[in-house]
């Protein structure tokens, strides 16, 4: 109670619940969107009505978004619930004195954890971070089942197309890529996985997906989905490999994975053919479609994850913030205590009226039987 907490996430109905839970617990909550395209204005207004300070409007542009993040920074939060480390990185670079006063951060995404690890490696992380993304109850479910379903669902809703029989290039086979590939296959599509990590590529192959280099996958792909967390996974040099009427969508962290600006320069003509779908006519007569202007398709072009997934992620974030407030987490990037992970999973199972058995006497492997009792 009384602590200042910044919540920088995709501001929509599920995330709003997290902010209100914290506020109801007595925290002074300030919220902003972690992406300029994902805020739901009606949700932001509802949060304001509940007494939460909000700095975010949908599709206001990057300049306004940057100002919103700095406005949150200027409230001098003690704790940050971050997505992509968007607020944390900006405070480190643009509000250094306020950054030094932060007492802890929980981070939601793979990209954000990587950014915070780099900050730590540079000796610029003076407080504890809980990598919520690395909790089993987050990445095994949110990244895989949540993003997998919501990405494919958004694409099919936007295009009104059939997935069965389609070839789908999936760039990246982390937990997000795994989830997308599984949902594509479940609907009758063929996943063509592109990876730079040979272990992940081999895993995709053993999972039964097609695996190849980027050029091979693009030549076949009806849909091209980026899930790398990096920049320009699809850039100018790749456009010539796209088949005509290929549909591009992004499921990575930001709208930087598909170089839409380069595509606009390359194209001879452009038109918005329907809500969330833009068509580019290339000089050789091929057409290429981009969904949600290259922003996160499941959020900018859909409703995001189901609540049955997000309750797990925000349980991790909320409990993580509580642990930080207790002052028991050491400086640096940390993983949440596995016992807390287990308790969250147990509570989730109980909500479905599922209760687990326990090992009975004689079922555990007793090392004393092999080595003798401790002497």
Per-segment meaning from a language model:
Residues 1, 31-166:
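Glycine/serine-rich phosphate-binding loop and adjoining beta1-alpha1 elements at the start
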Residues 2-4, 12, 33, 127-165, ...:
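Adenosine-phosphate binding glycine-rich loop
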Residues 9-27, 142, 146-221, 226-228:
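Glycine-rich phosphate/diphosphate-binding loop of Rossmann-like nucleotide-binding domains
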Residues 26-27, 52, 97-100, 125-127, ...:
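A short helix->loop->beta-strand "cap" motif at the edges of active sites that frequently abuts
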Residues 33, 79-84, 95-111, 230, ...:
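ADP-ribose/adenylate-binding Rossmann-like module
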Residues 72-73, 216-217, 241:
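Structural alpha-helical scaffold elements that stabilize or flank donor/cofactor-binding regions
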Residues 75-76, 219-220, 244:
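Alpha-helix C-terminal capping/helix-to-coil transition sites in glycosyltransferase folds
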């Amino acid at each position: 109670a009384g602590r200042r907490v910044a919540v920088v996430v995709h501001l929509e109905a599920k995330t709003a619940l997290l902010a209100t839970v914290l506020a109801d617990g007595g925290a002074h909550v300030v919220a902003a969107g972690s992406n300029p395209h994902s805020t739901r204005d009606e949700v932001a207004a509802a949060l304001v009505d509940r007494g939460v300070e909000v700095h975010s409007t949908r599709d206001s542009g990057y300049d306004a978004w940057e100002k919103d993040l700095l406005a949150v920074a200027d409230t001098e939060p003690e704790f940050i619930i971050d997505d992509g480390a968007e607020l944390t990185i900006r405070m480190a670079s643009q509000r250094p004195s306020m950054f030094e006063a932060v007492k802890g951060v929980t981070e939601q995404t793979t990209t954000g954890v990587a950014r915070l690890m780099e900050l730590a490696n540079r000796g610029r992380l003076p407080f504890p971070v809980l990598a919520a993304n690395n909790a089993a109850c987050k990445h095994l479910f949110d990244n895989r089942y949540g993003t997998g379903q919501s990405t494919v669902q958004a694409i099919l809703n936007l295009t009104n197309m059939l997935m069965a029989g389609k070839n789908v290039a999936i760039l990246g086979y982390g937990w997000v890529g795994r989830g997308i590939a599984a949902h594509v296959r479940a609907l009758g599509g063929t996943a063509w996985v592109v990876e730079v990590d040979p272990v992940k590529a081999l895993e995709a192959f053993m999972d039964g997906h097609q695996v190849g280099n980027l050029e091979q996958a693009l030549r076949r792909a009806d849909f091209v989905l980026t899930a790398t967390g990096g920049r320009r996974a699809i850039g100018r040099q790749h456009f010539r490999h796209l088949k005509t009427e290929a549909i591009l969508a992004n499921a990575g962290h930001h709208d930087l994975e598909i170089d839409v600006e380069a595509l606009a320069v390359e194209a001879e003509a452009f038109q918005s053919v329907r809500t969330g779908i833009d068509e580019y006519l290339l000089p050789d007569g091929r057409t290429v479609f981009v969904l949600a202007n290259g922003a996160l398709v499941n959020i900018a072009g859909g409703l995001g994850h189901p609540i049955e997934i997000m309750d797990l992620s925000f349980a991790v974030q909320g409990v993580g913030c509580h642990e930080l407030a207790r002052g028991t987490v050491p400086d640096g990037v940390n993983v949440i205590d596995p016992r807390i992970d287990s308790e969250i999973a147990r509570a989730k199972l109980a909500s479905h009226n599922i209760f687990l058995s326990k090992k009975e006497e004689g079922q555990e492997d007793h090392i004393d039987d092999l080595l003798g009792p401790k002497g």
